[in-house]
C-alpha cells in the first residue's frame, strides 16, 4: 500500500513538472535539469554560470527585448557569462513593467547593493561610488551616464539604457572606459555588460538577464574570477528583483 502511494505521488509530481515545463518559453525545458525547473516553478531565482553565448538557454525570435539582451552579450563575445531567470504569475503583477522602469532608472540604488563573498566571509558595498553625469529622456526610453567604482576595481564611466513598451521592459548597462585592477587593465572599454528584460509568456512574467565580461582567462585563477563575477551578478540581480512588489 505504501509503495503504491509513493509511486502515485512520484507519477503525479512527474506529470506536474512536465506540464509546467511545457508552459515555459521554448528551450528552457530543453536545456535545464529538473532541479532548475523545480526551482523556477517554486519562485526561486535561477542563476547559471554558462561562460559563453553558445550556452544561452533561450532562443532568439520570441520577443524583441530578449533578442536585445542576447545581442548585448553577443556583441562583446563574452567569455565570462552568467544567465539569470526568475518567474512570477502575471495575475496580480500587472504593474511589473512600470515597477521595473522606476527601480532601474534610480541609479542611486546602486549604493545600497551589498556584495557578499561567502568564501571569504565578508560583505561590502558593490558600488561604493555612483555619480550621475547626464540623463536623456524620450518616449518610453531613458539613457543615463554615470561615473562608478566597483569594489576591488578602478573607477570607470558607464552608460545605461532603459526601454519599455508592448514587448515588456529592457535594461542595458555597459562600461565606457576601461576597468583596472591595480595597474592591470582587467576589462577594456565596452567589454562589461548587464542586460535584463521582463516579458510575458503563457500567463507568467519572466525576468531574464545576462551578465557578461570579455576579459583574459588566466590559467589557475579562472575559477576564482568566475566565482567572484557570478557572486556580483547574483547580488546585483537579486537586489533588484527584491525591490519589486511581487504577488505569488
Question: Each PLM stretch: what is its role?
Answer:
Residues 182-187, 213-231:
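A short acidic/glycine-rich loop-to-helix N-cap element
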Residues 188-214:
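Compact beta-sheet-dominated globular domain cores
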Residues 158-195:
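Hydrophobic-ligand binding "helix-grip"
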Residues 23-151:
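Hydrophobic ligand-binding cavity/cleft-lining segments
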Residues 1-6:
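Bacterial N-terminal signal peptides that target proteins for export
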Residues 221-248:
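Alpha-helical oligomerization segments
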Residues 8-15:
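Bacterial N-terminal signal peptides
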Residues 16-23:
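Bacterial Sec-dependent signal peptides at the C-terminal "C-region" and cleavage site
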Amino acid at each position: 500500500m505504501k509503495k503504491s502511494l509513493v509511486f502515485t505521488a512520484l507519477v503525479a509530481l512527474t506529470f506536474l513538472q512536465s506540464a509546467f515545463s511545457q508552459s515555459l518559453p521554448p528551450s528552457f525545458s530543453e536545456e535545464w535539469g529538473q532541479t532548475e525547473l523545480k526551482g523556477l516553478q517554486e519562485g526561486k531565482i535561477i542563476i547559471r554560470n554558462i561562460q559563453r553565448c553558445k550556452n544561452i538557454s533561450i532562443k532568439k525570435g520570441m520577443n524583441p527585448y530578449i533578442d536585445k539582451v542576447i545581442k548585448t552579450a553577443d556583441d562583446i563575445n563574452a567569455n565570462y557569462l552568467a544567465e539569470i531567470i526568475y518567474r512570477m504569475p502575471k495575475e496580480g503583477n500587472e504593474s511589473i513593467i512600470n515597477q521595473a522602469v522606476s527601480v532601474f532608472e534610480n541609479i542611486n540604488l546602486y549604493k545600497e547593493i551589498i556584495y557578499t563573498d561567502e568564501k571569504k566571509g565578508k560583505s561590502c558595498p558593490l558600488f561604493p561610488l555612483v555619480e550621475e553625469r547626464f540623463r536623456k529622456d524620450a518616449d518610453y526610453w531613458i539613457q543615463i551616464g554615470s561615473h562608478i567604482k566597483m569594489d576591488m576595481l578602478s573607477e570607470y564611466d558607464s552608460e545605461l539604457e532603459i526601454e519599455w513598451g508592448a514587448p515588456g521592459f529592457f535594461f542595458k548597462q555597459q562600461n565606457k572606459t576601461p576597468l583596472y585592477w591595480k595597474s592591470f587593465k582587467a576589462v577594456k572599454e565596452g567589454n562589461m555588460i548587464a542586460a535584463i528584460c521582463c516579458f510575458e509568456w503563457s500567463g507568467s512574467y519572466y525576468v531574464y538577464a545576462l551578465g557578461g565580461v570579455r576579459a583574459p582567462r588566466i590559467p589557475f585563477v579562472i575559477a576564482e574570477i568566475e566565482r567572484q563575477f557570478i557572486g556580483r551578478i547574483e547580488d546585483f540581480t537579486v537586489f533588484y528583483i527584491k525591490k519589486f512588489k511581487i504577488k505569488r
